[in-house]
Structures are given as C-alpha cells and as structure tokens.
C-alpha cells in the first residue's frame, strides 16, 4: 500500500480524531483527565469498568450490547450515558434494572415471559403499563366467563327435569358447550409482597444531627460539620460523589461506627429498621430461612413460612440454608427482616442492589405510600424521584439540603454551581 492510500484509509476510520474521541468518552464516563494515560493495572476496579464501557462505545459501532451499564456509576455519569445513547445512531441492546435509564434510552422493549420472546414498541414504562392493563383485562374477562358459566350450570341444574323449560335448558347447554373460559398463563414474573407498617406513629422529633464529621483511615474527608433535623414526613435521599460517605453516615446513626466529631440523637418515639449495604455478617450461619427469620420477629413456624412465601420463598425453599442464597434472595430476606420490625423510620443503603425489576417495583410502590420517615441512598433514578421529598448531599465542605424533586435537583444550574463549590471543583 502507498502512504497516500494508508492516509485515505486512516481518514475514513476518523483516525485523526481518535485520541480526542477517546478522551471525550473517558471524561464523559467520569475518568479524570490525569488518569487518561495511566496504565490499566494502576486504576481502581470502578475506573476499569468505566474504561471498558468507553472502549465499547468507542468507534461508533454498528451494534452495541450493554449488560447493566449503569452499575456503580454516579448520577452525572448516568445522565451523560443516557444522553449519549439517546443520540446514538446505531442499534443498542441493553439489559438494565434502572427504569429511568431504560425509559430515556430505549425505543423498543423485548419481553421474555410465558416461555416466549415478544418485542413491543415503546420504552419500559409504556410496556409495563400496557402489560399490566392487558393482564387486568384478561382477569376481568375470565371472571365474567366464570360467572356466566355458573349461571348456565345453575339454570340447567334447576330446570333440567322441567318439561316446560326443556327448550331453554337445551339452549343453555349449547351455550355452555361453546363457552370458553381461557386460563391465564402463569407468568415467570413474580412480585413480592412488601408492606411496611409502622407500629407507632412518629412524634415531631425524628433525628437531630449536630456537627457530624468523618474521615477515612487514609484521611479522605467523607463529610464535615453536618447539621440538620429530620422532620415528620421527611423521606430523605442522601447523595455524595463518594459512596462511602453515605454508608459511613448510615453506620454512624445506627451506632455501628463512631464519628470523628459531632453528635446525633433520635426522637423518643422513633423505631428504626436498617438495610445495610453489606449484609455478609447476617448470613454467616447454618440456619435455614425459617429459623433465620424467626430471630427477628415473633410468630410460629407457620407464620414465618407464610411471611417468606410473600417474599417469593415457597415449599422446600424455606428450609434452605441462608448461607447458600443468591444476592437477590439475601436482599429479600433482609427486607423481610425489616418488615418484622414494624418501624416508623427506615434506613436504606442502596436498597435496590441485587434486586430484579419486579422486586424493585414492589419495594418502590410501598415506599411511596409508607407513613413513616425514610432515610436512604440509591443509584436508581426512578426510585429516588418517586420516593424522596428532600435531598441532602454530603460533601467534604458541609451539606446541600433541599426540599425538591430529584429531577429538578440534577438539572438546576444553581445546584450545579453549588455542588462545584462544595466539592472544590476548579
């Protein structure tokens, strides 16, 4: 090949912009510029995942396959990825538990259920509402058909020996033969029964936090001089660029970790139920599910089995050892444990981790109507948007505390300026 031919081929592949395109993708996905020329082996695990995602996006591929691409991404990066994929001109196949992400990116939804694969036009929310409507219609049609069947059978039973009614009886027998009561195919999609019921209504004093500060062992400031009061009815989402900040805060207010400075106090009427990020210690045991759950609430074996049944553990499954459960099964056990507390304040550290979409939907729906207080962190945009009525962001220089919806928070220019200031961005 001649040099001119190589240059032509290089230009066709957009080679002159290769380095700047790569830098744009890396920066968009949250890899800082000073890490762009660092060896992969020197990056953290989360940074490596972002580089791999940038590699998949690079080169404008004809077909892009993404498996849970939003895992461990912060809100700015997820928003950037949503916008990038929404404007992507080629085919994208994506698997995700992030409903807002699916709604923002997808034009079609592939449903794998009833042993079949079906494609629907529309995003996730449109598919979900349509599928629920179709199911309700099927159930109504079946109920009407069963009622009609009972009416016909009752008429035939009463008048089969009545000569004067013989023609009517014969007519109804024919109608009964033609009546088809279609069985509704059982779905592989199961929704757990998640219901949090506070045993006691909370008073006006929920939680008071004064001057709370915490650093890591390496000296990294997670949050500093945090002051706020939680009011009755508050459902607070905690945000931070450093996920360890939220976890440390929750561990402190649950008495599992000491702050470097400051105090906190719970109201006398408050009972809490805590869902920690790391539940490993809860499952380092040989207990089966029934015995494990019995540690956390009152009730006999039959009651506990029924409770586990609502959380989608049935039959012999309830006798499995908890140590062999999957991540999603362990999360459902932890949620069951919380429900037994009948607490009026829930503390949830990234509660949708390991859960499937059905469990997330059930969890989300109950928290929207929950009558107590909620303090939580989450990567799930839809979960935050529909549950939280207050936002507190923990930064190294204090907090941002706003009574507003999440969508407004992440799009507000004022908040963007405030966040940059609080994090010391240049």
Report each predicted region and the residues it spans.
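Proline-centered turn/helix-capping motifs that create local helix->coil transitions or kinks
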Residues: 164-168, 178-188, 265
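ABC ATP-binding cassette signature C-motif
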Residues: 1-142, 199-426
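ABC ATPase nucleotide-binding domains
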Residues: 138-158, 165-174, 190, 413-426
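ABC-family P-loop ATPase nucleotide-binding domain
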Residues: 184-206
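Short amphipathic coiled-coil heptad-repeat segments
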Residues: 23-29, 154-158, 174-179
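Short hinge/gating elements
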Residues: 8, 158-159, 192-195, 291
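Short, surface-exposed loop/turn segments at secondary-structure junctions
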Residues: 37-38, 162-166
